[in-house]
A protein has these predicted regions:
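A gly/proline- and charged-residue-enriched helix-loop-helix capping module
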Residues: 139-156
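N-terminal secretory/targeting leader peptides
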Residues: 31-142, 160-162, 166-377
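Intrinsic low-complexity/disordered segments
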Residues: 6, 26-28, 34
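Bacterial N-terminal signal peptides
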Residues: 13-26
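N-terminal secretory signal peptides that target proteins for export/translocation
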Residues: 1-10
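Extended interaction regions within the primary functional domain
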Residues: 2, 23, 30
Length: 377
């Protein structure tokens, strides 16, 4: 009782809601059902035992990462791969009453033994972890892969040592691009426009272009555009299509402003308590799930763009008639200049001078970009 009382009220509410969500399956934590009592079995008959079952909090509901990859893996593939010895039940975090900003803390406490947390949710408390997806840093997915590869050893060690969380996989969402209601030829023409953003780093990028960043929730993108509160919106290529943006915006710029990374992690105590053969299976199979999600994200980024402009190759979305604005040499120069002069320095300001060393020892060398200490005021 003392331990639970020490947990902040918001986290206790999340824990209570998760218990309700998983109640029909017997609770949140991994468990095995006990063997049938010997008295109920015939002499010499094998003892029946129920599968060992995991409770997983997954990523965002309703998107391909979850519906085509995470959910099938945990609900079906785990049992198939283990010959029925292990099973799992998964619920998306945004339908489980779990605040995205609290997921890391819930993992650390063990309230959520196994869960997916958006790295953008670290901005307020742990801005150092957001480094690999700064706005303008990764103009394509190949660059993002090398950026993350340079940062990953630091991230995994920090999560393990500072939070007691074992990072088992890192997922990616499709590219976040700019949709606009009025004609657009270059990024420079975003100056003066009110633009929906979803993170501090996107706001830094938009502000450096002379635009007006408007922090807006995903569900409010369409109402905000329709009401005229915003003129443009940064969102995923396919999620924008799903929202119906081709019917209310006319131009979409090809440059990925950000992507969106998520960590699938385990509370260390819960992880080490798993049967060794289950840990081995997950160590083998989760990298394959990660690779499949990255491939899915790359396909969906391209398909979203194809659908928005009404290309014949559109497969999963609704064909629109949008104008695709290519990345011009001027746009590429702007991206590089804004990244080095605004986005990176603002991240250092939020993160503190300790993050200068983190950057310069991880991402900086592979991107050819040196961070410097914030100037004291």
């Amino acid at each position: 009782m003392h331990i639970f009382s020490a947990i902040p009220l918001a986290l206790r509410r999340s824990a209570a809601w998760l218990c309700v969500v998983f109640a029909s399956a017997g609770g949140l934590h991994a468990q095995t059902a006990p063997a049938a009592p010997a008295s109920s079995a015939s002499p010499g008959a094998p003892t029946a035992q129920k599968p060992y079952k995991l409770r997983i909090v997954g990523g965002l509901a309703g998107i391909s990462q979850y519906t085509r990859q995470e959910e099938p893996f945990w609900n079906k593939e785990l049992a198939r791969l283990s010959g029925g010895r292990f099973e799992a039940e998964i619920v998306p975090f945004d339908r489980a009453g779990v605040p995205g900003s609290e997921m890391l803390r819930l993992l650390q406490l063990g309230v959520v033994p196994f869960g997916t947390t958006l790295m953008s949710s670290f901005t307020a408390q742990y801005p150092e972890y957001t480094a690999p997806d700064l706005a303008g840093l990764n103009p394509d997915i190949a660059t993002l892969k090398t950026t993350l590869a340079a940062f990953r050893p630091y991230l995994e060690k920090a999560l393990r040592d500072q939070h007691g969380v074992e990072a088992l996989a890192i997922y990616v969402y499709p590219a976040q691009v700019v949709f606009c209601k009025k004609p657009l030829r270059t990024l420079a023409e975003l100056s003066g426009r009110r633009i929906r953003v979803s993170s501090s780093t996107q706001a830094d990028f938009v502000g450096a272009l002379g635009g007006v960043p408007v922090l807006t929730g995903f569900a409010q993108i369409v109402p905000s555009l329709t009401a005229g509160n915003t003129e443009c919106a940064i969102t995923g290529t396919m999620s924008g299509n799903t929202l119906g943006l081709p019917s209310i915006t006319s131009h979409v710029h090809a440059l990925p402003i950000t992507w969106g990374l998520a960590v699938f992690g385990a509370n260390q105590t819960a992880w080490t308590a798993l049967p060794p053969d289950l840990r081995a299976l997950l160590r083998r199979e989760l990298p394959r799930l990660e690779a499949a999600i990255w491939e899915e994200s790359e396909r969906e980024t391209a398909d979203g763009m194809a659908c928005n402009r009404g290309a014949a190759s559109c497969a999963a979305g609704t064909k629109g008639r949008m104008t695709l604005v290519p990345v011009s040499p001027q746009d590429e120069r702007s991206r590089q200049d804004i990244l080095s002069s605004t986005v990176l320095p603002r991240w250092v300001q939020r993160c503190g001078n300790r993050c200068v060393d983190i950057w310069n020892q991880t991402i900086g060398p592979v991107r050819g970009l040196v961070a410097t200490s914030a100037v004291s005021k």
